[in-house]
């Protein structure tokens, strides 16, 4: 029995460090800090790279919280499509990503999302009732945490997971799971939109279904038949933007 307990402890510790490696792979930096970018400073003095895509006609501003293999340079390739669809967007590179200093952890991602939210409210003057956290993949974790603790118009989760460990296994075998969205969904009070492709090979479709079922506030879903994890908007086509508009206009 002692041997089994010791083996479990070793496996749990190994799972913890493996999860950190898998959660935060940090892609190569693909941009330079030019005039389109600026810095936010965390309470402990860490500089985070950020970018704001304005839209004077926008009624909704997305706080875009990206996946674990994205940074601002990559976002610059497709965020303009959100602006063209009528939205303003703010994004920030998590600590350790892009030109942001520091180290990514679950707690730090929550803090980074909060800092970006505060910038929207206090520096850009965007009222809470016009802010929608848009959490893609890993970004679903800080998006849900933010919406749980701050007033927002609604929340959009795309390619989101029930929890980080459950991306690899349906059964929570080890303690210390991270970004446990599934436990937080019933406590959200804002409107929720869940977007997921049925052929998502990175975060399986059942995650999106579970999150949607767990939400108790007003909710809508866009489950795309055959849809992948990345590039879902392009795969879906005009229907994606129509459903996004229908949700945001209801807020």
Report each predicted region and the residues it spans.
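C-terminal catalytic histidine-bearing segment of alpha/beta-hydrolase fold enzymes
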Residues: 209-213, 217-251
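Short alpha-helix in the alpha/beta-hydrolase fold that links the catalytic acid
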Residues: 78, 190, 204-213
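Acidic catalytic loop of the alpha/beta-hydrolase fold
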Residues: 198-203, 229-231
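Short beta-strand/loop motif that positions the catalytic acidic residue
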Residues: 187-189, 194-196, 200
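Membrane-embedded segments
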Residues: 47-119, 123, 129, 141
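Alpha/beta-hydrolase
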Residues: 65, 94, 157-158, 224
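Primarily recognizes the serine-hydrolase "nucleophile elbow" in alpha/beta-hydrolase
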Residues: 116-123, 128-173, 184-187
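An N-terminal hydrophobic leader/cap segment in hydrolases
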Residues: 2-42, 51
């Amino acid at each position: 029995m002692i041997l089994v307990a010791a083996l479990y402890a070793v496996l749990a510790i190994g799972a913890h460090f493996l999860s950190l490696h898998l959660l935060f792979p940090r892609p190569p930096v693909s941009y330079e800090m030019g005039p389109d970018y600026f810095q936010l400073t965390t309470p402990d003095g860490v500089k985070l790279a950020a970018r704001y895509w304005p839209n004077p006609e926008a009624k909704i501003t997305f706080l875009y919280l990206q996946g674990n293999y994205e940074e601002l340079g990559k976002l610059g390739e497709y965020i303009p499509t959100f602006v063209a669809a009528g939205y303003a967007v703010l994004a920030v590179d998590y600590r350790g990503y892009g030109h942001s200093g520091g180290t990514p952890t679950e707690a730090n991602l929550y803090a980074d999302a909060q800092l970006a939210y505060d910038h929207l409210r206090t520096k850009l003057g965007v009222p809470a009732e016009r802010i929608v956290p848009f959490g893609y993949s890993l970004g679903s974790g800080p998006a849900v945490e933010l919406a749980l603790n701050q007033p927002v118009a609604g929340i959009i989760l795309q390619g989101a997971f029930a929890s980080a460990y459950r991306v690899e296994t349906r059964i929570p075998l080890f303690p210390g799971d991270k970004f446990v969205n599934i436990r937080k969904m019933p406590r959200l009070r804002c409107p929720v939109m869940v977007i997921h492709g049925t052929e998502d090979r990175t975060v399986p479709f059942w995650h999106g279904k579970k999150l949607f079922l767990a939400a108790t506030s007003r909710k809508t879903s866009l489950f795309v038949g055959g849809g992948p994890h990345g590039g879902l908007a392009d795969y879906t086509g005009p229907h994606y933007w129509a459903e996004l508009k229908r949700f945001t206009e209801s807020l």
